[in-house]
UniProtKB/Swiss-Prot annotation:
The active site is at 142. It is an enzyme of class 2 (transferase). HAMAP family: PIMT (MF_00090). NCBIfam families: pimt, PRK00312.1. It catalyses: [protein]-L-isoaspartate + S-adenosyl-L-methionine = [protein]-L-isoaspartate alpha-methyl ester + S-adenosyl-L-homocysteine. One of its GO terms (molecular function) is protein-L-isoaspartate (D-aspartate) O-methyltransferase activity. Belongs to the methyltransferase superfamily. L-isoaspartyl/D-aspartyl protein methyltransferase family. The lineage of its organism: Bacteria, Pseudomonadati, Pseudomonadota, Betaproteobacteria, Burkholderiales. Residues 38-48 have a biased composition (Pro residues). This is Protein-L-isoaspartate O-methyltransferase 2. Residues 1-82 are annotated as: Disordered. It comes from Cupriavidus necator (strain ATCC 17699 / DSM 428 / KCTC 22496 / NCIMB 10442 / H16 / Stanier 337) (Ralstonia eutropha). It is found in: Cytoplasm. GO terms for cellular component: cytoplasm.
Length: 306
């Protein structure tokens, strides 16, 4: 811990702040006359110490204000033309509203986070289309409508102005969904198993300086037990089932949203494996309620790190 250098006490004696002049030379036959010095001021009586208040726990972090992210996005994309414009983000949010997204907090987050910062420069012109785009390493950035829909499902039942509490994201990718989550949650933890993507997400998010978001490199199928329990968990990759470790890390009353594989009926030729969203609500320590939702398409959920 750094320390502050000692400060001079005030008021200072006059001779400490006025430049001293040399005494005049003695004149023959006359005694030297000394210049009178003012008396040092009487120090003020010490003030009685104020009683110390008991320490209270630090408040939980809050979602980053949209205005702060917008200002940082503007600074990061100065001179970027139309893609840096808030109008492009607002138009995307308006299209999602027309498509059925109703959570205004989610729509505000979509209208705030600059998606073009999270895609390759050559794809910037497509950043505000409702389309999944490649980000390298055989991974994609999800469609904005899917991001909004999944987060809306996590927030279902909350008051309009109430944030999610502690959220875990499995599959950081380029960092876009994590940035959107940071606008609607107090704390966001995101895990990525592919090292170059983890580093890319850090670089993408750095200009936005999001204080309530923590990125981790590791196996997402194991979750993040040191930070559990989580009030919400969101998976950005599809597995045959939701890993048991993630269910264990979901808080009672919490929600998990994930794409999962759906096997075709046995004995039916020509059918392929499909995917659908699965919403899991934890009712108590041992009981989970599952709701199958619409069809989706995600990259596969894999274990380990690379």
């Amino acid at each position: 811990m750094s320390t502050t250098p000692p400060r001079n006490k005030f008021p200072l004696p006059l001779d400490a702040v006025v430049e001293r002049k040399p005494a005049p030379a003695r004149t023959a036959g006359l005694p030297a006359v000394g210049t009178p010095r003012p008396a040092a001021p009487t120090p003020a009586p010490a003030k009685p110490a104020k009683p110390r208040l008991p320490r209270t726990a630090a408040p939980a972090p809050a979602p980053v204000p949209a205005s702060a992210v917008e200002q940082r996005a503007s600074a990061a994309t100065a001179g970027g033309g139309g893609m840096a414009s808030a109008r492009a983000r607002a138009a995307l949010a308006a299209r999602l509203r027309a498509a059925g997204i109703r959570d205004e907090r989610v729509l505000s987050a979509i209208a705030t986070v600059p998606r073009h910062l999270f895609v390759e420069p050559g794809l910037a012109s497509q950043a505000y289309e409702d389309a999944a785009l490649p980000i390298g390493h055989q991974q994609t950035i999800s469609k904005p409508s899917v991001v909004a829909r999944m987060i809306e499902l996590l927030r279902e039942g909350l008051a309009a102005d109430a944030p999610l509490e502690r959220v875990l994201e499995i599959g950081t990718g380029c960092g876009y969904q994590a940035a959107v989550l940071s606008q609607v949650a107090r704390e966001v933890f995101s895990i990525e198993r592919i090292r170059p993507l983890h580093e890319q997400a850090k670089a993408n998010l750095r200009p936005l300086r999001v204080p309530n978001l923590r990125l981790h490199y590791g196996d997402g199928m194991l979750g993040l037990p040191q930070a559990a329990p989580f009030s919400a968990i969101i998976l950005a990759a599809a597995g045959m089932e939701v890993p048991e470790a993630l269910l264990e890390q979901l808080a009672i009353g919490g929600r998990l949203i994930a794409p999962v594989a759906v096997m075709p009926p046995a004995g039916v030729p020509g059918q392929t494996v499909t995917q659908q969203l699965l919403l899991i609500e934890r009712r108590n320590r041992h009981r989970f309620h599952r709701t199958a939702l619409e069809a989706v398409f995600f990259v596969p959920l894999k274990s380990g790190t690379i």
